[in-house]
Amino acid sequence: MDIVPKADRWGFQDFVESSVSEGFLREPVLMQGMSGSRITRNGLPYVNFSGINYLGWQQDPQVLDAFCESVKRYGLSTGGSRATQGVCEPHFRLEALISEHLGKEKTLTFASGMLANLGFINAMTAKFNFSPRSGIDNRDAVLIFDRDCHWSLWKAASHLKYGESLLAFKHNDAADLERILNNVGDRKAIVVFESVYSSDGSVAPIGAILDLCERFQALSYIDDANGFMVYGEPQRNFYEEFQHLNRADFIMISLSKSIGLEGGAISANAEYIDAFEVLSGTSIFTAAIQPPTADAAASIIEQLKQESSIMDDYLKRSLTFRQRLLDSGLQINDTPSYITSVLIGKDSKAEQVREQLDAQGFCVPIFRYPAVKPNQALIRLILHRHHTDVEIERFAQSLDDLLGSNNARSRLGELQLATAQ
């Protein structure tokens, strides 16, 4: 009997080899130094359009100084769970600040936004008993997702049977959601959607969706990872939609985008958050945000609240960048948010475009299947606050040379993102 190597028996070797040959997997690139508007990879300098920490706080001298001072006071880690030791002071401060900003009673922080999403789904579909008297059972809940919700939400709900306990409505389509809610009847329902979607920059019809949730007595959960501290001010786009945000029962935020650090949080009424500490599992049973990170995040939030011009100026530059790409005839997403997606099309072309931009000194994120539908590959661009006008123009010209002549002067109206249904 021939002995088959373990890797072959499980299929990992064949999976990796075939994925590499088809361009789905590549050898990891070594990044040296900090991630910012410029980046060094394998010893070579690049203008970086791949980062999500677009305001550059992790390079800000004042933030770095404050972080180091917090390290001296609180150490590098909590050293234990909040259940056994108590809530670390920086976490308490951060949670109170987020609650105040979002207009909610209480907030629970997590080590990442993904853990917040995983914990939420786990808590809302859980059966748990402390004793015969003290328990909860929500296994009969039905979750209704926008079909373009983040992978972490779909992954968290993978234990639910699609079509029964897990349903999906067409992206940003309130009419389709209404149809589903009508069919759900009086079952306990939770509608899950995002404020701003990361691949195509689309913004949800927040008010219309929450109107339906209230009408059908469904709970609402907004993943505000990409909208937190960005929209909601009168002088900014989408002000009307974001005025409805705090009507949601639950708001999840990420600290890796506008705040530029790591961590996530869920804000809601106190009874939900008190229960989530136990039921989520991803807060109490795993590591928390580092105390100095929580401290620095709170300071950044306060600065963004006090100095609105920081975000105002950034959003204006993002719109100017978007218009520059439109003027080149590039096919980009419809929604004028700070996330700009440039359509490439065929998956086979996507890797060629990435390699050509790489050779010109640009680091860009290419989204291809399975991140999007087959042959709807795109470049997801987020301008960095510290990109220079020269860098932006040089990059726009490179895109024009590569894609401008092959794309009609129209916007991306039919982009349909793949889901994990």
Name what the model sees in each region.
Residues 81-82, 96-122:
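Short loop-beta-helix segment that forms the pyridoxal 5′-phosphate
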